[in-house]
Amino acid sequence: MNNLDISFNDEVNFLKNDDKDWIPWITNLLLSAKKEINKKNAQEMSINFVSSEKIHEINKKYRGKDRPTDVISFAIEDGLDEDFMAAFNDDPDFVEDIGDLFLCPEVIKRHSVEYETGFNREFGYTLVHGYLHLNGFDHIEDDEAKVMFGIQGKVLREYGLPLHPDQENHGKQIH
């Protein structure tokens, strides 16, 4: 259940930070999220750290939004039938490729200042949020949002990164 293989692509030298060893921090946080959603099979994914310009371009091309954002998730299994995937998930040797996250540390930092959450909390929030999207969670409908933000909040609290009060009470992003 603990196997999560993450490949990193760091176009902005985020991981070269002398103050923090981000790779184990990221891995442990995502393993906590994996455990919370009861994913038993091994998973693999990529995390790409990109500039504000690059994520703006991706956001415009794939989401039709002409602005930079903090995270974009490209789920491999998006739209696949749950019964189809269940056949694979029953195989203990199956490694599930869940997709790719694109994170923009510059936007995350700006959000952390704007929302007064601190960088680590905002980064953790964004990371878990993207990971849950890769695993099929969404927040378009209120009932979906309640489930997704409930999981997200629990994982972050247990990791020492509590949600902003607005997120706790309403299950919505403050972004």
Curated annotation (Swiss-Prot):
The keyword Zinc applies. InterPro entries: MetalPrtase_cat_dom_sf_prd, YbeY, YbeY_CS. Its main location: cytoplasm. Keywords: Cytoplasm, Endonuclease, Hydrolase, Metal-binding, Nuclease, Ribosome biogenesis, rRNA processing, Zinc. Its cofactor is Zn(2+). It is found in: Cytoplasm. Zn(2+) binds at H129, H133, H139. Its EC number is 3.1.-.-. Binds 1 zinc ion. It is an enzyme of class 3 (hydrolase). One of its GO terms (cellular component) is cytoplasm. The keyword Secreted does not apply. Belongs to the endoribonuclease YbeY family. Single strand-specific metallo-endoribonuclease involved in late-stage 70S ribosome quality control and in maturation of the 3' terminus of the 16S rRNA. This is Endoribonuclease YbeY. It comes from Lactobacillus gasseri (strain ATCC 33323 / DSM 20243 / BCRC 14619 / CIP 102991 / JCM 1131 / KCTC 3163 / NCIMB 11718 / NCTC 13722 / AM63).
